[in-house]
Amino acid sequence: TVYYQSITPKIAQSRANKDIEALRRYFIHSIGILVGTFVVGGVVIALFGNWGLNLIGSETQFLPTTMLCVMLLVNLLENNHATAAGFISADNRIPFFIPSLLSGVGTIILLWFFLSVLHWGIWGMILAPGFAQLVYQNWKWPSMIIREFIIHTHC
């Protein structure tokens, strides 16, 4: 997200200074802004997106609302764990390298299965990366950061 990217130098400095309280605050703000942006933006797009496209004379439309909302959720979870991974990598740790590769392989396999075997079309394209990331990445890195900040805060 733009906010997270703009504070990356502060995150690196706080990591170097072992300022867990500042890191905790930056993480909470980053995730809060991320979720707020997705919720507000998602609602606006779902309710007024096609109207806006018609207003500018576009011949295209957004995906049906259910697909759009699922796609936004998959993307929100992806951005959430990417933000957490950024906080981890600011400490010169990259534990997510191999899991990222495995998620990529899982996504390709699921895409093939959903598109070639189940013929799910666009749903398959939305759900394949969502399922592949949900297995591990979506929860592992955010929980690692939350655990780190809670343990250090309460010690």
Could you say what each language-model-derived stretch is?
Residues 20-24, 46-76:
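Interfacial segments at transmembrane-helix termini and the short loops linking adjacent helices
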Residues 49, 53-54, 63-66, 95, ...:
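Membrane-interface helix-loop junctions in multi-pass transport and translocation proteins
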Residues 18-22, 146-155:
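Interhelical loop/hinge segments that connect adjacent transmembrane helices in multipass membrane
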Residues 16-42:
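Membrane-water interface segments that mark the loop-to-transmembrane alpha-helix transition
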Residues 1-18, 90:
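Helix-loop junctions and terminal segments of transmembrane helices
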Residues 33-36, 70-73, 101-102, 131:
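Hydrophobic residues within alpha-helical transmembrane segments
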Residues 69, 73-100:
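Membrane-interface junctions at transmembrane-helix termini in multi-pass inner-membrane proteins
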